[in-house]
């Protein structure tokens, strides 16, 4: 079993490297870096009592910086994508906390809460924030995809049509982002529903009424995750578009040569004298 699973992982990496080339190798490297940050940075700090939400945002920033740097290098496009991604994730985190307080979801209404309470007795981990940390990590992939796509689109437009100004590039980025909002929102919703599918099936089997179902902690948590993640994706679009339009869309004014520049800066240029009906130079 373990040998077959290991071979499967090797084949997956080979396929990514063959199809993606250098980009595929860099994607695997960034994924490995994110895993190392989660296991060796986020988890130990959580056990020492550091806020899970705060340390998760730090890990998200580090992962975003390395991933987008490997894929796009140090450029205005990368800076725009990083700003848009981090802003979207922060918005998703803030929205999750606000929605959680409004709906009375404290973070203790999660699976394995009994085990977590036992672990918390011997550690300083703040288990009430783990739910919101999971929302932040789940929203990272979608916001990063949107931020990089918007920045790449604006850069391509600027290279193809340098005459476009900041406003035109921003509007074009917003138009492209509108098409991505719906698909990315569906991606987040489907991911959350897929992760809690067994629990949803159990609730359906008990034939609960609509009021009981919609007011349950499970459904409330799913709605909170979907709304906060979607809000983060939606706000990533204008932020990334605005930053990219400002950084990438700066026009370089080319000075047109004047007549005096053509004639070595002489202001007393005179037409050559001619004589005769055929205009021969004297």
Report the location of each language-model feature.
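Hydrophobic alpha-helical transmembrane segments of membrane transport and translocation systems
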Residues: 10, 193, 199-282
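Generic detector of multi-pass transmembrane helix bundles and their immediately adjacent loops
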Residues: 85-219, 223, 227-228
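Conserved, well-folded catalytic cores of nucleic-acid-processing
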Residues: 18-22, 44-47, 68, 102-105, ...
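Single conserved hydrophobic/aromatic residue that forms the stacking wall/gate
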Residues: 1-11
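Transmembrane alpha-helical segments that form the functional core of multipass membrane systems
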Residues: 13-118, 128-135
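Cytoplasmic juxtamembrane regions at transmembrane-helix boundaries
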Residues: 28, 151-167, 250-265
